[in-house]
Amino acid sequence: MLELENYKVFFKPVVISDDLKIIGKKDKENIKKSIDAKLKYRPDLYSLPLRRPLANYRKLRVGKYRIIFKLDEKNKACLIVGIRHRDNIYSEIGKRVIK
């Protein structure tokens, strides 16, 4: 039998304190479903790598929102650094991760 190795998903505190507060209830539910079904299962398969200056990060599209995360294959973990509307996600995340 094939055993699936699940990834652990972690959130930067700012995602909980800022990002999720501005997202509507229905969109939050869709985001949670996508995290549970895709990021915890095969984040490499369902996401795309980003280009510079966010080259070490990946994105998962959930409707009009983007989940930006760092993938740690060795430890089977995803660190979500931002969840925002597609119009402003990259500038906001750039401020958080590039210092």
How should these model regions be labeled?
Residues M1-K33:
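Arg/Lys-rich, positively charged N-terminal/basic patches that mediate binding to nucleic acids
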Residues M1-E3, F10, K70-K99:
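Enriched for short, Lys/Arg-rich terminal
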Residues I22-K26, R42-L45, N75:
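Residue-level signal for short amphipathic helical patches enriched in basic/charged
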Residues V62-K64, E73:
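A generic beta-sheet turn/junction motif
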Residues D36-L60:
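A short, surface-exposed loop/turn module that caps and links secondary-structure elements
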